[in-house]
Regions:
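Catalytic domains of carbohydrate-active enzymes, especially glycoside hydrolases
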Residues: 93-114, 318-324
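Active-site mouth loops of central-metabolism enzymes
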Residues: 79-93, 170-172
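Aromatic-lined carbohydrate-binding/catalytic grooves of carbohydrate-active enzymes
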Residues: 104-132, 151
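Active-site region of glycoside hydrolase catalytic domains
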Residues: 1-78, 121-123, 132-493
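Internal amphipathic alpha-helical repeat/solenoid segments
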Residues: 86-102, 120, 131
Length: 493
């Protein structure tokens, strides 16, 4: 047996890309509800209004500072298309979708709760009962099929009211608001949910500060404060979760990429080292329990003030994450030299193409060894249980006239990734809890806002402008993954 009997198999989704029902059931707006569609070459945009009535849209550029014009606040503006408003309509299709997951044999279903569906303004004293009831129905449906939920509390869904009133996570008010929200849902769903993640890809605070922290001014200091406030909030939620139910386990979620030097020049290796430090800073704090010296020296050099409190660091040290989960799709090649071909894509921008690997239409290299590298790196550094909670292939699938979708390219990608995981476990001794692919069912691409960049095992009839029946069609990969799960990863043919 390649994986232990308790190994969990499933798929992952996010409310802002999948759920829909953006103005139903008492839900308030969140950060992504004002984010337009885009493409591989056209960035998504945050739409805004000013008090004088002026409107506009600011491109969301990954890996760079983001700032709205002075006086602008995020808002829905006529004439723009917002793909998150409907997603692929899990809100009305949850029974059908969970049944499809059960047919594949899912042990686990990773989903996020829409914070503003529970607390429309993010910090309301009392919860929205319709929102609580919706997730009750979802978790009950999961329970009916023996599927365990893995719930992300915040997957880029910062309530818009907290952004417009406080400027997002740079303000310490959001610590208390998030803990209040977590307290409500952890008490309400006690016995239905025991696995929780606090913040999706917490290092998005650096890579995409509007998405990761609801920051409308993504300056270095605001990003540093936003990260610190999320670390403190996470520690408080770990403490709270254990008090509410000793069976609760709260994990970190990190966006991981392997970094390779383009040459053997030591300066290329130093560039790789710095890139890894920028990424692993977030897990050094949230999972490791302490601020690393390299980041403290950076803040000192740059004159960054965190607006912190002395007790913050005691909390961070005492209540680190119980386990470390992560997303991993690809690897990056870095150099201080010129190169013939630059890499493209929102997660590989700034690097160069790897001559040993093929890339997909969105510029992401297909790396068959990246998960083994990631798992060993994180296990050796932290020695805490690991969980791969996002890993998949985005592609423009074709729905045939007979309703079939032949996605051998996805099967080939996932086969290589599972083999890589297996080597990390059986050869290297990594403690791996489970695997949830991205994604269970087609949804809106976070990076580009497209539908044509599909990840799921189930095709959803919806296009880039929101047209389509929303009918579900299992792909070839659906039946392949069912076989993989049934064999606990032994049958990958």
């Amino acid at each position: 047996m390649s994986f232990k009997n308790s190994f969990t198999w499933g798929g992952a989704t996010a409310a802002n890309q999948y759920e829909g029902g953006y103005d139903e059931g008492g839900k308030g707006l969140n950060a992504v509800d004002v984010l337009t569609n885009g493409s591989a070459t056209e960035p998504r945009k945050v739409t805004w209004k000013k008090p004088n009535g002026e409107t506009g849209a600011t491109p969301l550029v990954w890996g760079k500072e983001f700032k709205l014009p002075e006086g602008a606040i995020p808002a829905i503006v006529d004439g723009y298309y917002y793909p998150s408003h409907q997603g692929t309509d899990f809100y009305h299709h949850y029974k059908e979708d969970i049944k499809l997951m059960a047919e594949m044999g899912f042990d686990i279903f990773r989903l996020s709760m829409n914070w503003s569906r529970i607390l429309p303004n993010g910090d309301d004293k009392l919860p929205n009962e319709e929102g609580l009831a919706f997730y009750d129905k979802v978790f009950d449906e999961c329970g009916k099929y023996g599927i365990e939920p893995l719930v992300t509390l915040s997957h880029y869904e910062t309530p818009l009211s907290l952004i417009t009133r406080f400027g997002g996570w740079k303000d310490r008010h959001l610590i208390d608001a998030f803990v209040h929200y977590s307290d409500i849902v952890m008490n309400h769903y006690k016995g239905k949910v025991r696995y929780w993640l606090t913040f999706n890809e917490i290092n998005a605070m650096d890579m995409a500060p509007y998405m990761g922290g609801g920051l409308i001014d993504g300056s270095e200091e605001n990003r540093a404060r936003g990260a610190h406030n999320q670390f403190v909030a996470s520690a408080k939620v770990v403490k709270l979760a254990h008090q509410i139910d000793p069976n609760n386990r709260v994990g970190q979620m990190l966006a991981y990429s392997a970094f390779y030097p383009y040459t053997c020049d030591p300066k290329d290796q130093l560039k790789v080292m710095k890139a890894k430090q920028e990424m692993l800073f977030f897990s050094d704090v949230q999972t490791g329990g302490r601020y690393p010296d390299y980041r403290l020296k950076q803040y000192e050099r740059d004159g960054i003030e965190l607006n912190d409190k002395a007790e913050d660091y005691d909390l961070i040290a005492k209540y680190p994450a119980d386990f470390l989960s992560f997303s991993c799709y690809t690897s990056n090649v870095l150099t201080t030299h010129g190169a013939d071909a630059k890499a493209s894509g929102n997660v590989t921008a700034g690097g160069v193409k790897n001559p040993y690997l093929k890339s997909n239409a969105w510029g992401w290299a297909t790396d068959p060894d990246v998960l083994r590298i990631a798992l060993n790196d994180l296990w050796d550094r932290y020695h805490k249980p690991l969980w791969v909670v996002e890993n998949g292939l985005g592609s423009a699938d074709t729905l045939e006239k007979d309703g079939s979708v032949h996605d051998d390219y996805r099967i080939n990608y996932l086969r290589s990734q599972i083999k890589s995981m297996c080597d990390a476990v059986t050869i290297d001794g990594v403690d791996l809890m489970g695997y949830t692919t991205w994604s269970a069912i087609d949804l809106v691409s976070n990076g580009t806002g497209e539908m044509k960049k599909r990840y799921g095992f189930v095709y959803v009839d919806r296009d880039d402008r929101g047209h389509g029946s929303l009918k579900r069609y299992p792909k070839d990969s659906f039946y392949w993954y069912k076989k993989v799960i049934a064999s606990n990863g032994d049958d990958l043919d």
